Structures are given as structure tokens and as C-alpha cells.
Amino acid sequence: MNLGFRTHSEAQDILKIYGIYIKIILLVCLPAFSATQRAPEFQVKAAFLFNFSKFVEWPAKSFSTPYDPFIVGIYGNDPFGRFIDETIKGETALGRPMHVERVRNVQDAVKCQILFINTPGKTAEILKTVKGRGILTVGQDPNFCSMGGIIRFYKEKDMVRLEINVQAAKESNIDISSKLLRISKVYR
């Protein structure tokens, strides 16, 4: 039976990405359901930030030395609290230890591989500054992708969804896996 996949490998890839998506949902939802509460939105977003490292390729210039850590930066108000630290603690990306940094200025922002920007009124300015530097920019402003951001979180039917600006990724020399693009809305 052919379900529209060109190859068996493509079908396996799709199942793998949906498997990860389901694991994220179960990971954050099951404890909450046992307490008759919903999983905090930012716990889900923290899991996404971690998993982006598995579906994105960065340019070689993203790291100064072979020993640099993989940095997930939070610029501006930190909505994640302990969730992002717990999610990243002890993990690796691209064979490098992952670290979370609360970024306070653009000089520190350019050291990040993933940069979550939560600075109302300053987002466009920050995006212009980090453009083309091999940084995966992530935000939740409704206009994030139109301002040049790469991945935007948004909610639809109480679910966290993704919108991806492929052109902005290309301009930053970031390659986003087709597996991630399949579960996202592509900004045009």
C-alpha cells in the first residue's frame, strides 16, 4: 500500500519526526494530566528549542574553536524559567555541550547558535544585527518572520505550532531539515 511516500526511507523519516513530536507532547503533558493541569506552554517551547539542534545545520563559522559550547540564548524577558535549564542540562548538540545563557546585549547574542528573542519593540533591531551570522533566531511576536526572524512559535487550538521563514534561514546560512519543515507553516 503506497501512502504517497516516494521511498521507504522517506516514510521512516516522517514517522521519526512525528515520533519526536509525540514524545515532546507526552513528556510535557503526562505529568500535567496526572495533576489535572495542562503542560505549561513554555515547557513545550523549551523542548522545541532543544530539539531544533537535531534538525538544523549551522555554518562552520558558528563556532570559533572546536571546543566552543553550543549556546541557546534567551534575549530579553525569560518566559522559560527553570524549564529551559532542565531541558538543556547535560545535553549535547553537534558533539558539543549545550549551555543556556541569558543574553543582555548584542555582543553576547552573536555567540549563540539558537537565540530566542523576547524584546517587544526591539526585535526588528536585534534581528538586523544578527542577520547573516549563522544564528537560528526564534521568537513569538506575531510579526517575527516578517521582521526577518527564522522560527516563530504561535498557538493554534491550544497547541504550540511553528512558522519558518526559509528565506531568512538561507540568508543566515542555516539549513533547516525538510523533516522540520513538514510539520511547520512556511512563511512566504
Predicted feature locations:
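Bacterial N-terminal signal peptides
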Residues: Y18-A32
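Short hydrophobic alpha-helices and adjacent helix-cap/hinge residues
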Residues: N2-G19, S34-R188
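Short intrinsically disordered, low-complexity coil segments enriched in acidic
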Residues: M1-N2, C29
